[in-house]
Amino acid sequence: MTRWWAAVSDLSLRRRLRPALGLLPPGSGLLVAVSGGQDSLCLLKLLVDLAPERGLHLHVGHLDHRWRPGSERDAQRVAVLCNVWGVPFHLEIARTPPASEAAARAWRYCWLEQIARGLALERVVTGHTLSDRAETVLFNLLRGSGGAGLGSLDWERPLGGGVRLVRPLLGITRAETGAYCLAHHLPICIDESNANLTFRRNRIRLELMPYLREHFNPLVEQTLARTGDILHAESELLESLLDEHWHSLVQEGRLHRNTLAALPLALQRRAVRRWLSVGLGRQPNFEHIAAVLGCLSAPNRTRTSPLAHSLLVEVQGEWLGLVGG
């Protein structure tokens, strides 16, 4: 790539990044999660260039899942790049490979939060893009998620321990991060597992999204991401409305039937979802929520089928309670 093209690419992405800079206040301490793939390399290069003018204090975190032979070479490449750019590098290697994508995600975020807290860094920054957000909306839609799930993968959220997770590239597509890396000759690490179609997200990325782009909407990524934005805003509104009723709804871990029944159906479902997620220690599915709502007019001592961990919901006079089966 010629220098002028690199300059144009740089200017374009920095302009696209500008709306997200409010998430990265001047003087912030950032732990940047860098796998070595194109999205995280693009993010790191943009932040390295922005750091002097914004007073950003950067550290890089890299996790080796040990899912494939040669994964240690990715860590070595990222470490070399960090040394060239003068960014402290932190590495974590899995003792045993995570058993699933969900387990790997939980492990990553737990470690990133711990490192950020240990270094007194306020934010963990990841390279999730607009393309990731579009794929997440589609993935959750196919799973039957409600508005909260479809509006997930937000720009910022609490990670824990006072650390916040920030995704400043959610307005930039994967094609753009690839072009940026090419223009700046960044050494992209290729993860062969991203081509494994046994992973449903890979099948969405490699088969379903290209089909939708060709046959339905050439801007399908932008359309789905915008839908996620709209649903997230509506979900936040519903959550704030639910907060206004929460203290009258829940007392001593039980749910008040008449107060719940007086709410609109959308708030009823959200109330039950929030209540069950605390009691069960996991997110309930639609059938669990429907079973609880079916108890609103049921006789005293009516019980649902077991929901999770042998727990079920029982009608206790004016209240609904979680009990062991």
From Swiss-Prot:
Q: Does the keyword Heme apply?
A: no
Mind telling me which InterPro entries this protein's record contains? Rossmann-like_a/b/a_fold (IPR014729), TilS/TtcA_N (IPR011063), tRNA_Ile_lys_synt (IPR012094), tRNA_Ile_lys_synt_N (IPR012795), tRNA_Ile_lys_synt_subst-bd (IPR015262)
Lipoprotein listed as a keyword: no
Gene3D superfamilies in alphabetical order: 1.20.59.20, HUPs
Top-rank taxon of the source lineage equals Bacteria
| GO BP: any one term | tRNA modification
Q: Which GO terms describe its molecular function?
A: ATP binding; tRNA(Ile)-lysidine synthase activity
Q: In which family does this protein belong, per the annotation?
A: Belongs to the tRNA(Ile)-lysidine synthase family.
Name this protein carries in UniProt: tRNA(Ile)-lysidine synthase
From what organism does this protein derive? Gloeobacter violaceus (strain ATCC 29082 / PCC 7421)
The primary gene name is tilS
